């Protein structure tokens, strides 16, 4: 199994990068979808606070790599898979341990651009409780508390998303083509 992981702070462009992978015919697994599905299963509203709580509980009860393990359940070992949203060093280590080839890419976007993008995308769990800037700071702090900094430090490559959407999509496409050939 070849795993290409995307790591980056909220609003950095991981979903756009994953869309490019899908367009290229690469299977994409979104780690946040595991948390959102578990929150739905528990009957919780789709808020950032609830998703954070569920993520915390899964990591506490099933181990730091719980979400990583869940997101690969039932996938073929022959596939190339993009994993969107790696958030900790434990998740990085899990993917390294199960993949024949593992590539970790940091998606970096300056904070002010992330804030604008989050405000524009309108996802239900982005902000339901007041000032978006404060909400993003809280979310960043929570994700850094999960070990996001360690995961970012483990990335072998950084793609800067400080350009137009088309330019960013092209940067992602070129990197994915290269990694799928290696």
Swiss-Prot record:
It comes from the Archaea. The keyword Zinc does not apply. Keywords: ATP-binding, Nucleotide-binding. Pfam families: AAA_17. ATP binds at residues 8-15. One of its GO terms (molecular function) is ATP binding. The keyword 4Fe-4S does not apply. Belongs to the UPF0200 family. This is UPF0200 protein Mthe_1012. The lineage of its organism: Archaea, Methanobacteriati, Methanobacteriota, Stenosarchaea group, Methanomicrobia.
